[in-house]
């Protein structure tokens, strides 16, 4: 290859980098629920309609797998993780196997439940294995907070409502016309990503004898943006 040709190729390479860097500022990635699913999708419309009628809190789930069966060590670890999660300002509440009422072994009544007068795996004198068996066979708890094999449990993290996100969703067209939509969306994405980082740090600093899996729409949105950004960066470098 001649020196002149090398100079020309180098010139075009530098020019393309300048061009890309100039316009990349206007590139936005939206991984909200209404962008991950087509807004014209009938199932999504149906879900959104009933979500407005019967609102539920956004949630994340940490699945925890034991190398053997669920034991007292795991129960104690769940309690430690739950307390750390509950201290996060973004978290409304946490539900785990530790908070699940024992219903059948001690004939807990609806009145007992209403008065918060019930036993859990933390305060019960009933045999530990019997409690796990009840939970694993329960239509309420099975495959929710415990699996049939009794080696996987979960922590359900209910998140506080994000007033900015609700306002943005309800007034999307207005903010788009005002040119404010992507600025507010970026702030919301940043807050969500920070929350995911906090939760992952809690997991990393937990007992690594167990295996942890973090899931949920908020986590998926965060990861989608990260993956796409990394792919774009890699592609731009290759090109």
Question: Predicted regions: what is each one?
Answer:
Residues 1-29:
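Signature of alpha-helical transmembrane segments and their immediate interfacial
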Residues 2, 85-86, 203:
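Hydrophobic C-terminal alpha-helix "anchor/cap" residues
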Residues 24-68, 75, 122, 129-146, ...:
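Solvent-exposed, non-transmembrane loop/terminal regulatory segments of multi-pass membrane proteins
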Residues 46, 74-77, 81, 90, ...:
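Stable alpha-helical elements in mature extracytoplasmic
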Residues 52, 76, 125-239:
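Extracytoplasmic
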Residues 59, 89-101, 142, 208-215:
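Short beta-strand elements
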Residues 65, 79-106:
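Short amphipathic beta-strand/extended segments in non-transmembrane regions
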Residues 79, 104-122, 225-233:
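Charged, often glycine-rich, active-site loop that binds/positions anionic groups
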């Amino acid at each position: 290859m001649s020196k002149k040709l090398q100079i020309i190729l180098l010139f075009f390479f530098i020019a393309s980098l300048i061009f890309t860097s100039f316009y990349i500022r206007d590139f936005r990635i939206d991984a909200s629920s209404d962008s991950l699913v087509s807004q014209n999708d009938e199932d999504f419309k149906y879900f959104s309609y009933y979500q407005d009628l019967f609102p539920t809190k956004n949630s994340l789930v940490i699945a925890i797998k034991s190398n053997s069966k669920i034991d007292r060590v795991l129960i104690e670890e769940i309690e430690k993780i739950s307390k750390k999660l509950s201290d996060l300002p973004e978290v409304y509440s946490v539900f785990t196997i530790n908070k699940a009422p024992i219903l059948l072994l001690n004939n807990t009544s609806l009145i007992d439940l209403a008065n918060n007068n019930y036993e859990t795996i933390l305060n019960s004198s009933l045999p530990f294995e019997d409690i796990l068996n009840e939970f694993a066979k329960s239509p309420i708890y099975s495959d929710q907070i415990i699996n049939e094999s009794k080696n996987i449990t979960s922590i359900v993290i209910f998140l506080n409502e994000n007033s900015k996100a609700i306002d943005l969703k309800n007034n999307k067209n207005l903010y788009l016309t005002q040119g404010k939509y992507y600025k507010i969306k970026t702030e919301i994405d940043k807050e969500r990503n920070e929350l995911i980082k906090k939760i992952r740090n809690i997991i990393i600093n937990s007992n690594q004898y167990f295996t942890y899996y973090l899931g949920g729409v908020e986590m998926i949105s965060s990861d989608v943006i990260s993956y796409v950004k990394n792919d774009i960066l890699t592609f731009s470098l290759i090109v």
